[in-house]
Amino acid sequence: MLLATDADHIHDEVDAALGGDHTVVRVHAGAEVLAAVDEHGPDLVVLVLQIGNMGGMATCLDLRLEERAERIPPQRVVMLLDREADVFLARRAEADAWVVKPVDPLALRRTAQDALAG
């Protein structure tokens, strides 16, 4: 599983919720996600909406463009949103699923399982 966040507490929360089922690889910026997808071939990509120089929405859109160009295999993407109003952004970015922070470990685990199931 690939996690893109620059916040240590988010990494800790996601690792606690999903780390038992997945190896969590972390990048600190959205611009690092594509290279990490190529290198690690994750089953799931978790993007925080607000990350460094390239936010979760732009990163998700970039992954979708790369998929359509057949440069990467299809990715399952879960976005961690700041508020309910951000659901619109997750839909526009074509995320497979999303969770509104603060992260509820059970909700995140369930959402990740649903996203992986397709």
Regions inferred by a protein language model and the residue ranges of each:
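C-terminal output helix
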Residues: 103-112
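Conserved acidic segment of CheY-like receiver
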Residues: 1-15
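His-Asp phosphorelay/catalytic-motif detector in bacterial-type signaling
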Residues: 43, 68-76
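Acidic, metal-coordinating helix/loop segments flanking the phosphotransfer/catalytic sites
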Residues: 28-44
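Conserved sequence signature across two-component system core domains
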Residues: 4-6, 27, 45, 80
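Conserved phosphotransfer microenvironments
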Residues: 43-65
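Alpha4 helix (beta4-alpha4-beta5 surface) of REC/receiver domains from two-component response regulators
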Residues: 58, 79-97
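Two-component signal transduction core modules
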Residues: 45, 98-99
